[in-house]
């Protein structure tokens, strides 16, 4: 299993104060020196709430690890990434809403202009992945557009798992739609969410599409996903950075790697 470390929220801390620390390159080399991280993931958002264009340039110039850049189909961002001298190892196209706190679901593959953006990256020799819900239609769209990777949105699975097996439902930011559900109902929905991820991962495998997954994964809910044999990569960020605040980034990375690289 490949471990993609998302370091967006290292930069979130920097941007809150509009200062120079924490240094994104230091985080990069801490990750590299653990010898457990396979790639670095960053999300270049339209509103630049964390990662900035300059961060992209610096990372691509010196990173010893592959860089996966998440982004929308925004024209300015597409043009910027296509113009880069140092190319990312892949671009993962994600949906984006300026009012969202974080990505809320998978990409709508009927989105106008999506095919053109995929072709623009392919023409520059940049591999494309699509951040999608685990659905057949998304896989067929990927196949039709010569996209060799998808990343399944695991938010539904992760939220249900957290509601059942953590104190998430007792916290200030509990998800209202899950808070009042009984454990039996949550277990059934969680089981169905897992089965859907497993079914669509198998489907993708037989279609020749590499399957990655991410969103909302943490030290507890990630374990079940390791039972999906066709899953090749997990991208995890917020939970690792959250733990790093308390125990340090190196230890937080190693603890996650111990779970997913068994």
From Swiss-Prot:
NCBIfam families: pdxJ (TIGR00559), PRK05265.1-3 (NF003625), PRK05265.1-5 (NF003627). GO terms for biological process: pyridoxine biosynthetic process. Homooctamer; tetramer of dimers. Pathway: Cofactor biosynthesis; pyridoxine 5'-phosphate biosynthesis; pyridoxine 5'-phosphate from D-erythrose 4-phosphate: step 5/5. Its main location: cytoplasm. 1-deoxy-D-xylulose 5-phosphate binds at residues 8-9, 45, 50, 102. The keyword Nucleotide-binding does not apply. Gene3D superfamilies: Aldolase class I. The keyword Transmembrane helix does not apply. 3-amino-2-oxopropyl phosphate binds at residues 6, 17, 216, 237-238. InterPro entries: Aldolase_TIM, PyrdxlP_synth_PdxJ, Pyridoxine-5'_phos_synth. Catalyzes the complicated ring closure reaction between the two acyclic compounds 1-deoxy-D-xylulose-5-phosphate (DXP) and 3-amino-2-oxopropyl phosphate (1-amino-acetone-3-phosphate or AAP) to form pyridoxine 5'-phosphate (PNP) and inorganic phosphate. Belongs to the PNP synthase family. The lineage of its organism: Bacteria, Pseudomonadati, Campylobacterota, Epsilonproteobacteria, Campylobacterales. It comes from Helicobacter pylori (strain HPAG1). The record marks 151 as: Transition state stabilizer. It is found in: Cytoplasm. It comes from the Bacteria. It catalyses: 3-amino-2-oxopropyl phosphate + 1-deoxy-D-xylulose 5-phosphate = pyridoxine 5'-phosphate + phosphate + 2 H2O + H(+). This is Pyridoxine 5'-phosphate synthase. It holds the Pfam family PdxJ. Its EC number is 2.6.99.2. Keywords: Cytoplasm, Pyridoxine biosynthesis, Transferase.
């Amino acid at each position: 299993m490949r471990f993609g470390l998302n370091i967006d929220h290292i930069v979130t801390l920097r941007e809150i104060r509009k200062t120079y620390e924490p240094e994104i390159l230091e985080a990069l080399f801490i990750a590299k020196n653990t010898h457990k991280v396979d790639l670095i993931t960053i999300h270049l958002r339209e509103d630049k709430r964390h990662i900035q264009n300059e961060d992209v340039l610096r990372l691509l110039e010196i990173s010893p690890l592959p860089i996966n850049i998440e982004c929308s189909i925004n024209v300015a961002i597409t043009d910027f990434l296509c113009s880069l001298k140092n190319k990312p190892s892949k671009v993962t196209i994600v949906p984006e809403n300026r009012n969202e706190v974080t990505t809320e679901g998978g990409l709508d593959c009927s989105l106008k202009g999506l095919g053109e953006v995929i072709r623009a990256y392919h023409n520059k020799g940049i591999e494309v992945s699509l951040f999608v819900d685990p659905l057949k239609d998304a896989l067929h769209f990927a196949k039709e557009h010569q996209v060799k990777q998808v990343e399944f949105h695991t938010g539904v699975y992760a939220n249900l798992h957290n509601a059942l097996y953590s104190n998430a439902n007792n916290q200030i930011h509990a998800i209202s739609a899950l808070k009042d559900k009984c454990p039996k109902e949550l277990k059934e929905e969680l089981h169905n969410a897992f089965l859907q991820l497993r079914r669509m991962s198998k489907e993708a495998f037989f279609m020749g599409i590499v399957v990655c997954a991410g969103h909302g994964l943490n030290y507890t809910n990630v374990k079940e996903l390791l039972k999906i044999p066709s899953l090749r990569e997990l991208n995890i960020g917020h939970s690792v950075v959250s733990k790093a605040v308390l125990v340090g980034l190196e230890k937080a990375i190693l603890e996650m790697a111990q779970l997913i690289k068994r």
